[in-house]
A protein has these predicted regions:
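Phosphate-binding site recognition
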Residues: 1-223
């Protein structure tokens, strides 16, 4: 959280990229750092124009009547935000790869805006598809390569921290970590059950378990 806060508090506006596999707490971390004057938008897989309508509605909470206009493309909505900005704030686009899937031109649009160095607000671009986020920002042929001021990759929590936080003996920590790894959301589900065996059955092995289809979803993220 401290690194993200520092990046957003710099003298000039920043482009911050955050990525990592699902359920690591990226969205929670970002929301914890953002203030009431910042804007958080969670994208979905609907087409680009619909996404802009949804984003405009969220932005209208900060900029009154922002959603009264129609924005025909991504450049127009980003420039409209810039025009309305009189005090720096942060705009977070979560699940950014979903936007790019529907609007392949979006990285080039952002490249243009960033290169102009006229943006008056911070941009945080977050995503769970590690392959896609890597390709968008760390591939030397990508439009946004070298444009990010900070690139943060969230990794699973390491075993020693889990053991200490939950006050587990060494053997129990290894057994539990072998199942749940260092993923905070998995540990939340584990805490709802009295024993490891019960949690394993209820959450993973049962066809009705919350995590029963989790492996498939994780592979789909990296297609």
């Amino acid at each position: 959280a401290a690194r993200l806060k520092d990046a957003l508090a710099r003298e000039k506006s920043s482009l911050v990229v955050m990525y990592g596999r699902r359920r690591l707490g990226k969205s929670t971390l970002i929301k914890r750092v953002l203030s009431d004057t910042d804007v958080y938008f969670l994208a979905d897989r609907s087409e680009g124009q619909h996404q802009r309508i949804l984003l405009a509605k969220v932005l209208a909470q900060v900029f009154p009547d922002f959603d009264k206009l129609t924005y025909p493309d991504w450049e127009s909505i980003f420039r409209a935000v810039n025009y309305r900005t009189d005090k720096r704030f942060t705009l977070c686009l979560d699940e950014f790869p979903y936007l790019v899937e529907q609007s392949p031109e979006l990285p080039s649009v952002l490249q243009k805006l960033v290169d102009e160095k006229q943006l008056k607000y911070n941009l945080v671009l977050c995503g769970s598809s590690q392959n896609m986020m890597y390709g968008l920002f760390l591939d030397s042929t990508a439009p946004l390569y070298g444009r990010a001021d900070e690139i943060m990759r969230l990794a699973p929590i390491r075993l020693p921290y889990i053991q200490e936080a939950l006050n587990l003996d060494a053997m129990s920590a290894i057994e539990e970590y072998a199942v749940w790894g260092g993923v905070p959301r998995y540990w939340e589900l584990r805490e709802n059950r009295s024993s490891l065996d019960d949690a394993l059955w209820r959450n993973i092995l049962s066809v009705n378990g919350t995590l029963y289809e989790e492996p498939i979803k994780l592979f789909q993220d990296e297609d």
